């Protein structure tokens, strides 16, 4: 648990600790993955596992942890009979996240954007542009430029080496 708490914003550590002590689940911190921030799965032996990317952004880490804990709660209550990001998950996610939704834990603009996001949360926080931009302010500096900041006609490349040109809308 200490490893998990080391990634959490300090004002949220006690709440997270209490939540995790009441939750029979294994949590593993992984190196950064390109396709997801976290993952929940039921293992063959019947136990549950959450994997979370190690990230220097404590707010992204906390949001991802709460997102995956909502999957765990839904799996406990409904087994595998519901959609992964359906109404049951959205309700569970709101219930878990709301106690953390205050400016002592999430600074503005994250707090206000996250409150709006919770009205109808997406399967991934990366699908909410305003939330992505609010969280980005707490990521380490990057030499990468987001595509939306490029001018029409500019070239850009992906990590796999593929090169593209930004076109006009």
Give, region by region, the residue ranges found by the protein language model.
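Membrane-targeting and insertion segments and their boundary/processing signals
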Residues: 35-43, 60-63, 67
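Catalytic glutamate of the conserved HExxH
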Residues: 64, 68-76
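Short pre-active-site segment immediately N-terminal to the catalytic Zn-binding motif
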Residues: 46-65, 79-84
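Metalloprotease/metallohydrolase-associated module, dominated by Zn2+-dependent proteases
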Residues: 2-6, 10-42, 49, 79-169
